[in-house]
């Protein structure tokens, strides 16, 4: 229970810390529960999207849904994506890439990358409201599971004391991996039309490409890499689903 609570405390800005004081050690064991947190963050997006979509155009409702998740998560993942893009865009060596990613100032790669990311996301407002709500919940959970596999396949690239959060995640046991997989995949099985199940492959492909990039450049991962992997896996799921729907 402490590990689950730690996951919600780490990945959201909601006052879960008021429920119970969680030992610092528990934050090393949060990775298997990322997809479970996706049920909350994706659920908030879907709820805001659905409710706002009843009284305004889907395009505006979609923007409000995106803002809602930014508020709930404190822009945690977007900050990671910006740092990731700055580091891999501006760094040519392992040491330089890590140094840039740790810099608190955003650079041109981060700014342009975030603009492109949100421009692509905004195109989803063309989808029917009900289907978009389902995609939001499914994509959040599954993409968090895909991103969690970075921890299983790569070592941490920095020393623990150099970590921004002062926490290095533990790798998952087989039963934790299974639980995360089921939690991430369940929305697909329960909500998505069967023709869209193949969309699960797009985040997996994105994960593999990012894994190869991190292994070659850093020989490991950082927290920023995890956030970037989640958002890019999610974006690939949305765009892949859009392609499947159009065709």
Ranges and model annotations:
Residues 1-74, 90-92, 103, 109-247:
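Hydrophobic alpha-helical transmembrane segments
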Residues 79, 90, 99:
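Glycine/small-residue-rich loop that forms an oxyanion/phosphate-binding "nest" at active or ligand-binding sites
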Residues 97-100, 105:
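Coiled-coil dimerization/phosphotransfer module
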């Amino acid at each position: 229970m402490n590990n689950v609570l730690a996951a919600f405390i780490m990945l959201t800005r909601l006052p879960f810390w008021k429920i119970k004081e969680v030992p610092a050690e528990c934050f090393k064991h949060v990775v298997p529960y990322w997809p479970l947190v996706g049920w909350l963050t994706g659920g908030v997006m879907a709820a805001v999207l659905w409710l706002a979509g009843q009284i305004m155009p889907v395009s505006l409702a979609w923007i409000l849904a995106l803002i809602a998740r930014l508020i709930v998560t404190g822009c945690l993942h977007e900050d990671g994506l910006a740092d990731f893009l700055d580091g891999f865009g501006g760094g040519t060596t392992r040491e330089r890439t890590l140094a840039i990613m740790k810099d608190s100032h955003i650079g041109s790669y981060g700014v342009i990358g975030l603009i492109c990311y949100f421009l692509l996301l905004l195109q989803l407002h063309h989808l029917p409201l009900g289907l978009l709500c389902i995609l939001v919940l499914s994509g959040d959970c599954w993409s968090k599971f895909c991103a969690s596999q970075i921890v299983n396949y790569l070592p941490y690239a920095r020393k623990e004391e150099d970590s921004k959060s002062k926490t290095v995640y533990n790798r998952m046991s087989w039963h934790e991996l299974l639980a995360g997989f089921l939690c991430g995949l369940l929305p697909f099985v329960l909500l998505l039309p069967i023709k869209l199940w193949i969309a699960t492959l797009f985040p997996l492909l994105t994960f593999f490409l990012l894994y190869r990039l991190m292994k070659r450049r850093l020989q490991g991962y950082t927290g920023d890499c995890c956030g970037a992997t989640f958002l890019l896996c999610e974006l690939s799921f949305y765009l892949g689903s859009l392609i499947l729907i159009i065709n």
